[in-house]
From Swiss-Prot:
Catalytic activity: naphthalene-1,2-diol + O2 = 2-hydroxychromene-2-carboxylate + H(+)
Protein name: 1,2-dihydroxynaphthalene dioxygenase
Entry EC no(s): 1.13.11.56
Protein species of origin: Pseudomonas sp. (strain C18)
Cofactors required: Fe(2+)
Protein encoded by which gene: doxG
């Protein structure tokens, strides 16, 4: 894949929510994100670093993923990737300056992945160097972002092969990394794909799902912040779907907790650097035992 036509990070995402106030409290008190409310009636923003925002919270009541925003390096890469998508038969829409400004980027195109997940490709995000990130609660460190983007997502797909083809076209590498034996004798396969040093930025499998978004992973630089987040979930009796554990692929210490929208957040620490060599696993290193059920991850991992 030419560098002239490749995504380099998950730059931003949009979510829709039914209870904006619950999300403001959750984002700050539970996770340590910064809320930025600029007086817009239909949205507010969540910050993790110097970017104007990393997450847009829309008040339209769907409680699901609205879009994922994938960054390319600049205008030449943007134009080349757009042409790649057209040549491969995908429908894209190049947005005007008004739409681009709404996302606070210099250039924007919109499409959908094969699972119907709204997908945006952009260049030139707004970076507010005069407005340092101010966490919603005290943090020992910060969030891992930079050239690794904001984190990773698992999204719903109905055709894994087509999803792999689409994300490969965007410049991602990766394939099946987990083959998990199920009680019914079948095997669940999960694919993980990366576009930078983060072990993966997107993942998917052939699993039924009520929502587009299964979970979002955010990574702390300090284990103390992960530990405090876990403590906050327990203290506030928020559902924990998977207990603390370490994944076999990204080596991150994480747990999975419920958000006010019913999908999962995966706070983590110490994720490994992505590798290009393919390999797969049949379980995790330890932990990630199922606790609260019904969140789409009722699978024994260790």
């Amino acid at each position: 894949m030419s560098k002239q036509a490749a995504v380099i990070e998950l730059g931003y995402m949009g979510i829709s929510v039914k209870d904006p106030d619950a999300w403001k409290s959750f984002a700050t008190d539970m996770l340590g994100l910064q809320v930025l409310d600029e007086g817009e009636k239909d949205r507010f923003y969540l910050r993790m670093d110097y970017w104007h925002h990393r997450i847009v919270v829309h008040h339209n009541g769907q409680d699901d993923l609205e879009y994922l925003g994938w960054r390319v390096a600049g205008k030449p890469e943007f134009e080349a990737l757009g042409q790649k998508l057209i040549d491969a038969g995908y429908k894209i829409r190049i947005c005007d300056k008004v739409e681009a400004q709404e996302r606070m980027v210099l250039g924007l195109m919109k499409t959908e992945d094969p699972g119907g997940n709204p997908t945006e490709i952009f260049w030139g995000p707004r970076i507010d160097m005069s407005n340092p990130f101010h966490p919603g609660r005290p943090l020992h460190g910060k969030f891992v972002t930079g050239d690794q983007g904001l984190g990773h997502c698992i999204v719903r797909q109905t055709d894994v092969a087509e999803a792999h083809k689409f994300y490969s076209l965007l410049g991602f590498r990766g394939d099946v990394e987990y083959r998990i034996p199920l009680p019914n004798g079948m095997t669940a396969e999960l694919s993980f794909m990366h576009c930078n040093a983060r072990d993966h930025s997107i993942a998917f499998g052939a699993m039924p799902a009520a929502k587009r978004l299964n979970h979002l992973m955010l990574e702390y630089t300090h284990m103390e912040d992960l530990g405090y987040t876990h403590q906050q979930f327990v203290k506030n009796e928020i559902d924990i779907a998977l207990q603390l554990g370490i994944h076999a692929n990204d080596k991150a210490l994480t747990f999975y907790g419920a958000t006010p929208s019913g999908w999962l957040i995966e706070p983590g620490w110490r994720g490994a650097t992505a590798i290009d060599e393919a390999e797969y696993y049949v379980g995790d290193i330890f932990g990630h035992g199922v606790e609260a059920t019904g969140y789409g991850l009722d699978v024994k991992l260790s």
